[in-house]
From Swiss-Prot:
It comes from Arabidopsis thaliana. Belongs to the glycosyltransferase 47 family. Residues 1-9 are cytoplasmic. Residues 31-500 are lumenal. It is found in: Golgi apparatus membrane. This is Xylogalacturonan beta-1,3-xylosyltransferase. It is an enzyme of class 2 (transferase).
Amino acid sequence: MAAPRSRRCSLSLLTLFSITLILISVSLFVSTKPANKPFLDYRNQFSISISISSPLEQNTTNTSFVSASPPLSPLGQSNTTNTILASSSSSSSFSDHQNQNKSPSPTSKKIVIRKRSGLDKIESDLAKARAAIKKAASTQNYVSSLYKNPAAFHQSHTEMMNRFKVWTYTEGEVPLFHDGPVNDIYGIEGQFMDEMCVDGPKSRSRFRADRPENAHVFFIPFSVAKVIHFVYKPITSVEGFSRARLHRLIEDYVDVVATKHPYWNRSQGGDHFMVSCHDWAPDVIDGNPKLFEKFIRGLCNANTSEGFRPNVDVSIPEIYLPKGKLGPSFLGKSPRVRSILAFFAGRSHGEIRKILFQHWKEMDNEVQVYDRLPPGKDYTKTMGMSKFCLCPSGWEVASPREVEAIYAGCVPVIISDNYSLPFSDVLNWDSFSIQIPVSRIKEIKTILQSVSLVRYLKMYKRVLEVKQHFVLNRPAKPYDVMHMMLHSIWLRRLNLRLGT
């Protein structure tokens, strides 16, 4: 039965009144919504990626906000037009009008928060290290001429200890990869590889990265010495000395890791390195110079006339490692018992030694030069009795003599051309060694006799101080030769900026 007319009117009025109240409430809610409250603000830790899509058109607009950006404004503010583009559509003109006057519904936006990339973190970390080193360099807290900038070096080493991570590629099989000689004059190659590649109480390095994305640099564990031994020998013809097989092996390895991982292509090899003391090691890049243009070679044979690049490559010391030992004997003899002015004993390898022998072989009691020691004369003990130890280049510029002299407390006399000395980024070689060009070999005695006693005693003291940087420890210790090699790599990485 139909309701009375008066009752229907009352219901209509009540319904109209309710609708009016609802509209007023909605209007108040929209008008009181804060206009400037940040939507998200993770400026210190994250980059923000926001995707807004139309439910009908399925269009997507991505906007990234880097950590230096201001706080994000509400998505519906008109002043965000240039930053965030929102797409929506409807078949109703009323809906179009409503969309122009209110924020998009929460269901129309997708918010994705992503952490900064691994490279961003690494570059940020390196920037902090650079700032700390620069600050330390300006304070000059250290007083010493052993280093070019003592404060900068010590701060840099501290930053390296706290931050530096190295990833060793796992690709490749022994004996050509992940293994190297640990004795004799090429031994530093295998010792370094063992430190960075092998797990164990004596080899687990603090610098090894747990994951490649956390690494600052990447070590290619390629043994030139093992390639020569297993791939080349025996060499029975002149053609057997061709470097083609060596080139093919290293280039194929780089192709594998560059295809499998993003890191080589990201830096064009600028944060990748190898270490070798073999005479052929400098030649690894000659097969494809463009590919290895930025690649870091850690070389004993650091000859600038044969392609060594001091601003890219790293000069490492050649250390003779007797079997079962980590270096020559220590001979800290007092200057008072050093009666020999200068000493050298060794084979006539290379042109420089031929010139040395021509002028000094067994010709002087103060400058004692031998190709073979006389009976009853001990090599190590004679170094310990000498003030200066002659270190002429042999077939190559590098020689174990420099390190042997330092171990013996004997001031090194470096006779070479085009030799980029180890760790010369930080060490002031002039403070603890004498450098004589090949053209002045005949003047050796005059030059050394002109060194005053005061200067000699200072140099002797610094030889004892610098020795710690040429000592091989397993596991490695701060400031030893292993850490100095890594520090040279660390400096190259500090000079490289990626992703900027």
